[in-house]
């Protein structure tokens, strides 16, 4: 990948009007090196083969509903596995609310969590755009 594709996370947050759910985590030096996004549905089931943890990770209705179907303990373990995999950040779309325990876990793992009011597909399209010559 050439260096021009990377973008500061803070620029993406500003451009996409993301609400920072973990403001105590400093994102000023965080760069997104892969101009793509990922919906970690398979990873939330425990499948991490071929997982590209350099991508911005998105939680939409499908992932959120799946996680809500799990027990609190299982849900925490799935988030722990995802947040421990050194992802740059996690974005909840459609105004979905991350649970307080998950926010605490994110702070512990130093993985910022954001919230977007946009539909998941719209967010994905715009998120991919910042890596395709459209500056964030």
PLM-predicted stretches and their roles:
Residues 1-82:
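Gly/Thr-rich phosphate-binding loop signature of adenosyl cofactor/nucleotide-binding cores
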Residues 49-58, 62-135:
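Feature captures the catalytic cores and cofactor-binding loops of soluble hydro-lyases/lyases
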């Amino acid at each position: 990948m050439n260096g021009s594709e990377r973008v500061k996370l803070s620029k993406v947050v500003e451009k996409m009007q993301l609400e920072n759910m973990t403001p105590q985590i400093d994102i000023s030096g965080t760069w997104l090196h892969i101009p793509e996004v990922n919906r970690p549905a398979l990873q939330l089931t425990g499948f991490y083969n071929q997982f590209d943890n350099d991508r911005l990770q998105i939680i939409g209705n499908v992932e959120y509903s799946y996680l809500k179907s799990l027990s609190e303990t299982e849900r925490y373990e799935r988030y722990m596995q995802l947040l421990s995999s050194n992802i740059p950040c996690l974005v909840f779309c459609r105004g979905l609310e991350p649970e307080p325990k998950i926010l605490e876990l994110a702070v512990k793992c130093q993985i910022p969590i954001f919230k977007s009011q946009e539909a998941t597909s719209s967010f994905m399209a715009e998120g991919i755009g910042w890596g395709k010559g459209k500056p964030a």
